[in-house]
């Protein structure tokens, strides 16, 4: 399966920069998936979870508050105001990532009625990591 280049950027720096088999994004009209050779598009993203399927078939999740994505045949660039990668090499690192994600959820809770879905996805991602 072909790979695509993925970058997730915030004003504070790079959250993810690497290759992926597929990316699922929380679009304004609903979730959508991107594979290599996808048609070009630029669209808005809502608060939600970006799922990144890596070459080894593992999935990494990144919680975002909102942003914009540019897709072309070989690359996906995601610009977001705030993001937390749900990953870590130890239980304490995962716990810190989950705490950061919960703080991000609290900051967007009043602005987005779909926050229950985001919370459920976050809890699911947490279970997969522990």
UniProtKB/Swiss-Prot annotation:
SUPFAM superfamilies: Epsilon subunit of F1F0-ATP synthase N-terminal domain (SSF51344). The keyword Cell inner membrane applies. The gene is atpC. Pfam families: ATP-synt_DE_N. It is found in: Cell inner membrane. Produces ATP from ADP in the presence of a proton gradient across the membrane. This is ATP synthase epsilon chain. Disulfide bonds: none annotated. It is a peripheral membrane protein. NCBIfam families: ATP_synt_epsi. It comes from the Bacteria. It comes from Sulfurimonas denitrificans (strain ATCC 33889 / DSM 1251).
């Amino acid at each position: 399966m072909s790979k695509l280049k993925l970058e997730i950027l915030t004003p504070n720096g790079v959250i993810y920069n690497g290759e992926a088999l597929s990316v699922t994004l929380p679009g304004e009209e609903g979730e959508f998936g991107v594979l290599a050779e996808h048609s070009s598009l630029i669209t808005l993203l809502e608060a939600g979870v970006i799922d990144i399927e890596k070459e080894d078939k593992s999935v990494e999740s990144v919680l975002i508050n909102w942003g914009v994505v540019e897709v072309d045949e070989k690359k996906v660039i995601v610009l977001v105001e705030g993001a937390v990668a749900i990953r870590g090499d130890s239980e304490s690192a995962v716990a810190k990532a989950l705490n950061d994600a919960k703080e991000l959820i609290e900051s967007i809770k009043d602005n987005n009625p779909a926050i229950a879905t985001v919370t459920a996805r976050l809890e699911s991602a947490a279970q997969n990591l522990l």
